């Protein structure tokens, strides 16, 4: 869990873990409310507007746009991305608890590359990202930071829209944006 504290304003970001985002947010708020009752040190009040539950299972799942990955050289082609993912699905991903949950959500076991292509959004929401990430990015550990920065620069805004929209609407960032706009004028 990552927290950005800015005086008494903060934004807590949590992986979606393939679960109901609203319920995860409520659980997180209740957890911190309970901790405040038990601890001597007062923690800041965690309210729903301070919590962003990621749309995807984990942050890593935001980095699986085959077109961008091809442009970066992470995969040879978009088709190679889907072929590799399907190969790993058949090999072991379908046996993971998140893979079983994905199959349950879909109502069928994926049997082809076209199934992978058709359900990429569900894969990013319900399949554990750490496993997927290592398949494609594991060999780039030494260049990881640079590679991810380049990925973010190349990716369309909509790939990160739930994160960027939440930040855009967060009070601290809205006021900073207004300050920056004033400086530009």
Q: Which residue ranges define each predicted feature?
A:
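Acidic, divalent-metal-binding catalytic cores of TOPRIM
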Residues: 1-185
């Amino acid at each position: 869990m990552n927290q950005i504290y800015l005086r008494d304003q903060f934004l807590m970001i949590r992986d979606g873990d393939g679960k109901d985002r609203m319920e995860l947010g409520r659980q997180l708020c209740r957890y911190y409310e309970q901790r405040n009752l038990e601890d001597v040190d007062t923690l800041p009040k965690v309210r729903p507007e301070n919590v962003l539950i990621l749309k995807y299972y984990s942050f890593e799942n935001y980095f699986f746009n085959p077109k961008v990955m091809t442009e970066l050289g992470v995969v040879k082609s978009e088709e190679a991305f889907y072929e590799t993912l399907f190969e790993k699905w058949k090999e072991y991903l379908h046996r993971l608890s998140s893979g079983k949950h994905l199959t349950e959500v879909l109502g069928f076991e994926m049997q082809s590359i076209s199934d992978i292509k058709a359900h990429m959004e569900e894969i990013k929401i319900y399949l554990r990202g750490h496993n997927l990430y290592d398949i494609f990015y594991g060999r780039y550990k030494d260049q990881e930071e640079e590679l991810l920065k380049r990925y973010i620069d190349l990716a369309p805004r909509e790939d990160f829209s739930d994160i960027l929209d939440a930040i855009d609407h967060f009070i601290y960032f809205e006021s900073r944006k207004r300050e920056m706009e004033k400086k530009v004028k």
